[in-house]
């Protein structure tokens, strides 16, 4: 259900803006998106797991706020990120 440390490192390498970057908005959104995908798969088979559903909604809101921040600060980075992650449009 949770993502492994190896998968997290792969995401950090893929979405980092520079060497050693683990906290940029792009990396955080990518990790959140992976966790959201995993939790969505879990909820497809465990429909009554409402505690996990609440966690999912919290993560989606957190990702939304992070994307809003990125859009306000640098629209080009925002557009590139949602394109790479396959989020909306």
Curated annotation (Swiss-Prot):
PROSITE patterns: RIBOSOMAL_S15 (PS00362). Belongs to the universal ribosomal protein uS15 family. Signal peptide: none annotated. It holds the Pfam family Ribosomal_S15. GO terms for biological process: translation. Keywords: Ribonucleoprotein, Ribosomal protein, RNA-binding, rRNA-binding. PANTHER family: RIBOSOMAL PROTEIN S15, BACTERIAL AND ORGANELLAR, SMALL RIBOSOMAL SUBUNIT PROTEIN US15M. InterPro entries: Ribosomal_uS15, Ribosomal_uS15_bac-type, uS15_NS1_RNA-bd_sf. This is Small ribosomal subunit protein uS15. The keyword Transmembrane helix does not apply. It comes from Paramagnetospirillum magneticum (strain ATCC 700264 / AMB-1). SUPFAM superfamilies: S15/NS1 RNA-binding domain. One of its GO terms (cellular component) is cytosolic small ribosomal subunit. It comes from the Bacteria. The gene is rpsO. Part of the 30S ribosomal subunit. Forms a bridge to the 50S subunit in the 70S ribosome, contacting the 23S rRNA.
